[in-house]
Amino acid sequence: MTSFYTSLNGLKNSQTDLSTIAHNIANAETTGFKKSSVEFADLVANGSAANPRMTQGLGATVAGINQNFGLGAIEQTGRSLDVAIDGDGFFATRNPENNEVLFTRNGNFQIDATGALTNFAGKNLQMFETDATGALVNPGVTVDAIIPVTNAGGADLSSLVIQNDGLISATYSDGTTEPVGRVALASFAAPTGLRPVGSSNWEATGFSGNPTFEAPDTGRTGQLRSGALEKSNVDLAEEMVGLITAQRNFQANAKAIDTATQFSQTVINLRT
């Protein structure tokens, strides 16, 4: 019966592989999405006194589902509040309701009625405060990106631009342009330890380490590409090959179960 359970584990592993590949394919067009792959490990029956030449295999198990944070294609949109990261950094967003900070590669932002620069879910983009020249005031502290809807002269906000160096510049109806802040990018010692929470967002864990916040093009964060978005890093051709392989593995394990069942039936028939 060992072969039956070994093949049953193989079926479950193939299902996990198929589900992961299907998830990748479904998100091939999701902005900032990062693909995943399943890592398997073999199982053996052994003990301290076991003869290594007699060690019996017990199949395989899922060792982990690994995220691939390789860069996706950067696509120009021409929109002033779209920005892509050409490097390893993450945008940080804060939920104003519970102060939860999440990290994303999706740089599609908009400004709401209060002047807050947010993502599609209403989370506030994090930035560094700057002085009138664009220099960082307090490099170690991030704040919500809040844009004054009127300047000191009472002129209304007319446009907003995120530049390649992360500087957020506001232009007002009187023709003046003022720096508001600089986008803060987060980096991690082990980004594969980030926990995905959906909508191309991740949260920090003990496996990823705490975030390090830096200005764009500093350390490992990478440069910004204004007027562009990072597409998913899913390669559909590669996923289709993996899908076929996973399907064949599933079929092979199902056949092994069928064979084990026939063996068992033969033994039962011998006893009757």
Spans of model-derived segments:
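Solvent-exposed, low-complexity segments and loops of surface/extracellular structural proteins
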Residues: 131-144
